[in-house]
Amino acid sequence: MSTFGELANEVVNNSYHKDLLRLSWGVLSDDMEGTGLMLMANLFNMSPESRLKFGRLGHLSTGRDNSKLRGHSITLMYALKNFVDALDDVDRLKCVVEKFAVNHINRQISAEEFGKIVGPFRAVLRIRMGDYFDEEIVAAWAALIAVVQAAL
């Protein structure tokens, strides 16, 4: 199993995946709140047990009407922006990932549990990327998610 540092280096040194991450981020970030809410809704639908980790957000089915869920969705998207912005500097990427990981460690979210976001992320990418969707884009995001998992 690769270490946190090794996985971060793999992401930073893979130009093709970095291009895919940046390209897809350009699409995903066009509606950051909507994309974040879609990602969270997909997570709750595809992994209903994950709802238990989000009790502090209140009633999750209210979507945009739930300010705590909206806030979490927006914060999540800005974390992804930080990751994408750090793709050329492994030390910076590690710093922003570690900060993000601390929030999840404090909520007792394991690496395995966090990895459940890949399926919902694939679904968001399929919708948002439309005809430009490709499994290589999913692989690029999965590699970045693996860095977060290694930090947990």
From Swiss-Prot:
<dbReference type="GO" id="GO:0020037">
    <property type="term" value="F:heme binding"/>
</dbReference>
<dbReference type="GO" id="GO:0005344">
    <property type="term" value="F:oxygen carrier activity"/>
</dbReference>
<dbReference type="Pfam" id="PF00042">
    <property type="entry name" value="Globin"/>
</dbReference>
<protein>
    <recommendedName>
        <fullName>Globin, minor</fullName>
    </recommendedName>
</protein>
<keyword id="KW-0813">Transport</keyword>
<dbReference type="InterPro" id="IPR000971">
    <property type="entry name" value="Globin"/>
</dbReference>
<dbReference type="InterPro" id="IPR009050">
    <property type="entry name" value="Globin-like_sf"/>
</dbReference>
<keyword id="KW-0479">Metal-binding</keyword>
<dbReference type="GO" id="GO:0019825">
    <property type="term" value="F:oxygen binding"/>
</dbReference>
<comment type="similarity">
    <text>Belongs to the globin family.</text>
</comment>
<dbReference type="GO" id="GO:0046872">
    <property type="term" value="F:metal ion binding"/>
</dbReference>
<feature type="domain" description="Globin">
    <location>
        <begin position="12"/>
        <end position="152"/>
    </location>
</feature>
<dbReference type="InterPro" id="IPR044399">
    <property type="entry name" value="Mb-like_M"/>
</dbReference>
<dbReference type="InterPro" id="IPR050532">
    <property type="entry name" value="Globin-like_OT"/>
</dbReference>
<keyword id="KW-0561">Oxygen transport</keyword>
<keyword id="KW-0349">Heme</keyword>
<dbReference type="InterPro" id="IPR012292">
    <property type="entry name" value="Globin/Proto"/>
</dbReference>
<feature type="binding site" description="proximal binding residue">
    <location>
        <position position="104"/>
    </location>
    <ligand>
        <name>heme b</name>
    </ligand>
</feature>
<keyword id="KW-0408">Iron</keyword>
